[in-house]
Amino acid sequence: MLNISKIFEEVKVMKNFTLNFGPQHPAAHGVLRLIVELESENVVRVEPHIGLLHRGTEKLIEGKTYTQALPYFDRLDYVSMNVQEHAYSLAVERLYLDSLDIELEIPQRAKVIRVLFSEITRVLNHIMATTTHAMDVGALTPFLWAFEEREKLMEFYERVSGARMHAAYIRPGGVAFDLPMNISEDIYKFVIQYRKRLEEIEDMLINNRIWKQRLVDIGIVSAEEALNYGFTGPLLRGAGIVYDIRKNYPYDDYDKYDFKIIIGEENNSYTRFIIRMKEMYQSLSIIEQALNNLRPGLIKLEGVNITAPDRAFVKKDMESCINHFKFFSEGFIIPANENYTIVEAPKGEFGIYLNANDTAKPYRCRIKAPGFLHLQGLNMMSKDHLLADVVTLIGTQDIVFGEVDR
């Protein structure tokens, strides 16, 4: 005789399903590994595992001179190269110039070139962020359109520095080289043409029914949560908080440029997409203003230790040749001092704490990357959403693991 009660005793209780996501997953933005706990297809918990791209950057910098350390910053967020060079150059300048009894200011032309390429970098980043996000969700066409435009911006990098990505162009005291002939006209033509391309991408995505269904009400973050988690950039401004370092704590004369801080109301994935799209329009406006502000002049400080001798003199004068060699091999000494410098990177607040100790090498360099703070909020943003929405949320955070793992 069949014992029904015994059968029911043997039925096991269903437990939550644990899934390993990445690090090989194409939507993992590099080397992100997530341990996702699911109840059916609903997310209960997301645990990010980081460190797979850790290279010990902060420790490596301690063994390099202030000049030799600069290229490390290109390799943190490798989509926003010049902005990080900008932050490091400002940090070194402030450390060095604070130690002098005289007041020195970076030449005006150098400041304008820095702003110009920082905003070109912001457009580079947002092109990557918005269109790869669209590709992760399933829209391939915007990605193909935008990367055609991104190639043109990479060519501007190459024309000023010789490198498409790791330019080492913005340096303490100014910039490495002056702008080559006709590049200003070409950048201006790009701005005019890219505005039309942006409108085409907006037409494809902004009112797209499927795109909105995948993004609206996904990953809502309140203003209080954004502040508690240390969010900055589009993730903070999406909550309606007006915070942009270019406006709040201007550097390199950003206060002289006319642009708006784009904020949102409902801080969901769709809001953050709109913010990044509108920020590209603002960056194009700043680029135009910078081109109009370009005047003949010096591109770096002269007569100070933090800039290399001009190459024109190196080939004519033995003393300049020796100074040039010693500048790159031995570096320059900065008296004991410390500072914390922040810039508005495309992803948020990028900060550098530098500590000098009367040597030619930093005693300590601490890097604050926005992506590291954003990633810790992924669990909070993912709860009660579907597994497919986790891919959307990784995209809306715009994570790059060079800066997260360092």
UniProtKB/Swiss-Prot annotation:
It is a peripheral membrane protein. Pfam families: Complex1_49kDa (PF00346). It catalyses: a ubiquinone + NADH + 5 H(+)(in) = a ubiquinol + NAD(+) + 4 H(+)(out). Its EC number is 7.1.1.2. Core subunit of the mitochondrial membrane respiratory chain NADH dehydrogenase (Complex I) that is believed to belong to the minimal assembly required for catalysis. Complex I functions in the transfer of electrons from NADH to the respiratory chain. The immediate electron acceptor for the enzyme is believed to be ubiquinone. Complex I is composed of 45 different subunits. Component of the iron-sulfur (IP) fragment of the enzyme. This is NADH-ubiquinone oxidoreductase 49 kDa subunit. It comes from Dictyostelium discoideum (Social amoeba).
